[in-house]
Amino acid sequence: SETNATAPQNQLIPVPAGTVIQEKDREDELYGWDNEYGRHISDVSEFKASKHLVSNREFLEFIKDGGYRNQSYWTAEGWQWVQYKKVTAPGFWIQQEDGSYRFRSMLTVIDMPWSWPAETNYLEAKAFCNWKTEKMGLPIRLPSEEEWYRLLDYTQTPDVSDWEKAPGNLNLEDAASSVPVDKYAFKQGFYDVVGNVWQHTETPIRGLPGFQVHPLYDDFSTPTFDTKHNLIKGGSWISTGNEIIRSARYAFRRHFYQHAGFRYIASTAPIETPDDRYEIDPEVTPYCELHYGNEYFGIENYPEKLAQMALNHAQGRPKG
């Protein structure tokens, strides 16, 4: 059956250097969230990227090699999560008494679909890459957001407005699940450049140059500008609408599970980690302290003070 199919052997394919332009202006005809608007130009060095998304079969090798027991593969955050949750495999894997695995899909438990992309959180994907670095002797990691766009451009993957049909397992046009990682071919020899599952990146979200908070949803993006929310790209089988356009930028905490997997790259280029955190903005910090701290500039916690005033006012009043 398809779920028991043998997964393809993965390999690295070169991606030449190039300039990436991320931009969206206020006149764009497609809907967007505030973090999509602005303009960012980056020169991306050459790298190699895996032909396929990492399949369940490929991820199994990490598990069998003691990946969840070896602290050296994990970031400090990742190892803390492993210890706290006592994790031994991705969240949708169910280990049987004989040591084999089954898979919890959206609606039922099925035989392990070895050829489907491994659905992990960022922490697991990062640990896998560190393990792969040791095994391959190459600087293996997740792509940055800019490197993901460079692969998108190199494979000449069209934006949604130019589709006649979704180029991958997207928009609910194929299946109500993932499909094998070698089903949807793209140019230059790659598969699943978009679709099937979201793809983890190394990049914590921040606003693009020219970013402005939208007044109708002022806390959609800015609370995630804390270096703790990493971008996922490309959409999954169930992604529709804004989620599948080129400019989409969604980010989640690194321990969260989505319909997300990953592609790894080999690159010596450094990863730029933003430090423009929302909580240290001088205009925001007093507001946060006033609402969530104990006292700021001699002013008591505002919501707590209001609650205490309400309780005092209610003293002696009938309960009912």
Language model segments and positions:
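Functional-site microenvironments in short loops/helix caps that host divalent-cation chemistry
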Residues: 1-37, 42, 52, 67-242
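Acidic-aromatic/histidine active-site loop/patch
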Residues: 55
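C-terminal, surface-exposed recognition/capping segments
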Residues: 31, 36, 192-210, 216-320
